[in-house]
Amino acid sequence: MADAPSPVRMTYGGYLRLDELLNLQDGPEGYAPAPSNDELHFIIVHQAFELWFKLVLRELKEARAALLEPHVAEASIPTIVHHLERVSEIFRLLADQWKVMETLSPQDFLAFRDRLGTSSGFESWQMRELEVLLLSLIHI
């Protein structure tokens, strides 16, 4: 009988895929020169927003699914509240994250704005999905 391969030891960096994650701030393929400190700041803040939007969407979808049940069991209320409290804390954090964004002066932003082409934060599909999802929660 052949020896079973030894399991790969999970590491912090491996679990979070840090090599991939931390290379995402370098800009698109062939992007040169490398982003300046101000552009890197801009990229990281916006990527962090998108990561938080991902979690907010998941939490809100879980809460909505539970609330749309024909009968919302009393035992499920703490879980629903947990999802909504987490979303509330994330929104609080996102508001503070704008304070970090405000450390980028308009002049500093204009120094690399042309590199963004016609792109805009309004293109965030997660933000659109969040708007639609929040509107749907009004009618529950």
Regions found by a protein language model. Give the residues of each.
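Acidic, low-complexity proline/glycine-rich segments
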Residues: M1-S36, L51
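Amphipathic alpha-helix face/heptad-repeat signature
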Residues: P7, I44, W52, I80-I90, ...
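Short, charged/polar, low-complexity loop and linker segments
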Residues: L24-H41, A63-A75
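Feature marking long nucleic-acid-engaging regions of large polymerase/nuclease enzymes
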Residues: D38-E50
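Short secondary-structure subsegments characteristic of cysteine-rich extracellular domains
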Residues: E62-L94
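Long amphipathic alpha-helical segments
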Residues: D96-F112, E129-S136
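Conserved small/polar residues in nucleotide/adenosyl-binding loops
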Residues: I138-I140
